[in-house]
From Swiss-Prot:
Subunit structure: Biogenesis factor component of the plastidial NDH subcomplex A.
Protein's name in the database: Protein CHLORORESPIRATORY REDUCTION 42, chloroplastic
UniProt lineage: Eukaryota, Viridiplantae, Streptophyta, Embryophyta, Tracheophyta
InterPro entries named in the record: CRR42-like (IPR021495)
Known role: Required for both formation and activity of the chloroplast NAD(P)H dehydrogenase (NDH) complex of the photosynthetic electron transport chain. Functions in assembly or stabilization of the NDH complex; probably involved, together with CRR1 and CRR6, in the incorporation of NdhJ, NdhM, NdhK and NdhI into the NDH subcomplex A assembly intermediate (NAI500) to produce the complex NAI400.
Main location: plastid
Keywords, sorted A to Z: Chloroplast, Plastid, Transit peptide
GO BP terms in the entry: NADH dehydrogenase complex (plastoquinone) assembly
One CC-aspect GO term: plastid
Null allele phenotype: Specifically defective in the accumulation of subcomplex A, a stroma-protruding arm of the chloroplast NADH dehydrogenase-like complex (NDH).
Naturally occurring in which organism (per UniProt): Arabidopsis thaliana
Entry's localization field: Plastid, Chloroplast; Plastid, Chloroplast stroma
């Protein structure tokens, strides 16, 4: 998706019953349009309910409770821990349910867990 900007200048002595002193107002219109040669963005594998695995231990962790608590990570969340995404927050912040509780984690600390759907023959 591309954005195009169009600038227009208006000069009017009387607008909405108010006399202006001859100054002009700058207005900008923004239009969104699809461009055919633009490659589609890949959809994230992460969504609510997706299993994840911690790849790097965060230095501080924040609980996802109604009254959140920020504390130093003293070995509570370790690389290799597995959990599920409960919800998504703005700016790549995710509420993740781990075995020790639900925490708000940045997306750089975990990745989607690839589950093998193998045949049981």
């Amino acid at each position: 998706m591309a954005l195009s900007f169009v600038s227009s200048t208006r000069f009017s002595k009387m607008q909405y019953g108010i006399w202006h002193s001859g100054s002009f107002t700058q207005r900008v219109s923004v239009r969104c349009c699809e461009i055919a040669n633009e490659a589609p963005r890949p959809k994230s594998k992460l969504q609510v309910g997706s299993p994840i695995i911690i790849v790097e231990a965060p230095k501080v962790i924040k609980t996802a409770a109604s009254m959140p608590c920020l504390r130093a990570n003293s070995g509570l969340v370790k690389p290799g821990d597995v959990g599920r995404i409960v919800s998504r927050k703005p700016k790549d912040l995710w509420a993740v349910r781990l075995s020790i509780g639900t925490y708000l984690l940045d997306g750089k600390y975990f990745k989607a867990l690839e589950l093998d759907e193998g045949d049981s023959d």
